[in-house]
């Protein structure tokens, strides 16, 4: 007998701890559909609309608003209330000129910060890996599931490939034009996307490479001069001289 696949249902008690839901009031909670972010690092659009933005009091109200096309993610209307929303996604409330970015925050892991219309025109995406495709072109695979193709004139000397794994692209949305690039190196500003220091912002002081990425340790220094460490896997570069995105007051 073949496998029946994963369950389409999720008990509230088993949902990621950072989801802002009333676990004792409801037995079941909406489960994210397959999409650009894993369930461990995202939350369903319905929970964002109802529990974080407060545009609905019930799941039924949230589903209706989403189905009517009132919410854009990264410049595109999303009508699937289970659509997974994750780090650096840009949310637009259609018709009211409100824009938000999902960022890592202390304790809550994922939070929203209101941004300007100008800032809502771009997104930061971390390069997770690179692959060589037909004709020697380079494909950059990003943290939110999207891919960017770098066209190469001479595969034997790919001078166009100036991007490294774990660096960050500043992309226009929804058209995906590369506007800027932040490499992963000492001296750049980064935000921590997970672990006990989630949401902290600092300048990278040193990178100690291990046998695996999760064993590599990065030391950062915050604006107050306090040093802290985290896994390389949690490092998300956000700027060289200054952050490219708006951050909570006091973060940097």
Curated annotation (Swiss-Prot):
SUPFAM superfamilies: Alpha-L RNA-binding motif. One of its GO terms (biological process) is translation. Disulfide bonds: none annotated. One of its GO terms (molecular function) is structural constituent of ribosome. Keywords: Ribonucleoprotein, Ribosomal protein, RNA-binding, rRNA-binding. InterPro entries: Rib_uL2_dom2 (IPR014722), Ribosomal_eS4 (IPR000876), Ribosomal_eS4_central_region (IPR013845), Ribosomal_eS4_central_sf (IPR038237), Ribosomal_eS4_KOW (IPR041982), Ribosomal_eS4_N (IPR013843), S4_RNA-bd (IPR002942), S4_RNA-bd_sf (IPR036986). One of its GO terms (cellular component) is cytosolic small ribosomal subunit. Residues 43-106 form the S4 RNA-binding domain. HAMAP family: Ribosomal_eS4. Belongs to the eukaryotic ribosomal protein eS4 family. PANTHER family: 30S/40S RIBOSOMAL PROTEIN S4, SMALL RIBOSOMAL SUBUNIT PROTEIN ES4. This is Small ribosomal subunit protein eS4.
């Amino acid at each position: 007998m073949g496998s029946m696949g994963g369950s389409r249902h999720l008990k509230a008690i088993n949902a990621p701890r950072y989801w802002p839901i009333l676990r004792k009031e409801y037995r079941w909670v909406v489960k994210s559909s397959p999409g650009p972010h894993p369930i461990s690092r995202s939350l369903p659009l319905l929970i964002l609309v109802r529990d974080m933005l407060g545009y609905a009091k019930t799941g039924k109200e949230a589903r209706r608003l989403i189905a009517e096309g009132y919410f854009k993610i990264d410049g595109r209307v999303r009508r699937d209330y289970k659509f997974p929303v994750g780090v650096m996604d840009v949310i637009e409330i259609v018709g009211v000129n409100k824009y938000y970015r999902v960022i890592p925050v202390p304790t809550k892991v994922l939070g929203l910060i209101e941004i300007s219309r100008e800032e809502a025109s771009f997104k930061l995406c971390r390069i997770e890996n690179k692959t060589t495709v037909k004709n020697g072109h380079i494909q950059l695979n990003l943290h939110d599931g999207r891919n960017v193709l770098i066209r190469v004139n001479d595969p034997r000397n790919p001078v166009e490939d100036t991007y490294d794994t774990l660096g960050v692209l500043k992309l226009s949305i929804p058209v995906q034009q590369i506007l800027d690039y932040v490499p992963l190196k000492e001296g750049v500003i980064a935000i921590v996307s997970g672990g006990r220091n989630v949401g902290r912002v600092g300048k990278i002081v040193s990178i100690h490479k291990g046998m695996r990425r999760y064993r590599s340790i990065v030391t950062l220094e915050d604006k107050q001069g306090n040093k802290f460490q985290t896994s390389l896997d949690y490092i998300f570069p956000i700027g060289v001289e200054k952050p490219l995105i708006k951050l909570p007051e006091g973060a940097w």
